[in-house]
From Swiss-Prot:
The keyword Chaperone does not apply. It comes from Bacteroides thetaiotaomicron (strain ATCC 29148 / DSM 2079 / JCM 5827 / CCUG 10774 / NCTC 10582 / VPI-5482 / E50). This is Putative membrane protein insertion efficiency factor. The keyword Ribonucleoprotein does not apply. The lineage of its organism: Bacteria, Pseudomonadati, Bacteroidota, Bacteroidia, Bacteroidales. GO terms for cellular component: plasma membrane. Belongs to the UPF0161 family. Its main location: membrane. Keywords: Cell inner membrane, Cell membrane, Membrane.
Amino acid sequence: MSLKSLVRKVFSFLLLIPIYFYRVCISPLTPPSCRFTPTCSAYAVEAIKKHGPVKGLYLAVRRILRCHPWGGSGYDPVP
């Protein structure tokens, strides 16, 4: 395994920890409110796993910023 690959995996893992914490500990306590399918947290996990930590985080933040009452809704897959 190259150093670049190892660094990418470590940073991806570090970004996924708070998302999994949210999904397990916080999300069950709040009513469903995501306007999109898949949910924003599922989208973030998939984006980070598919595109790596930098582009995945960028895609996840863009998605979260679109998730508001005046934004879009519906099916929005990870590109």
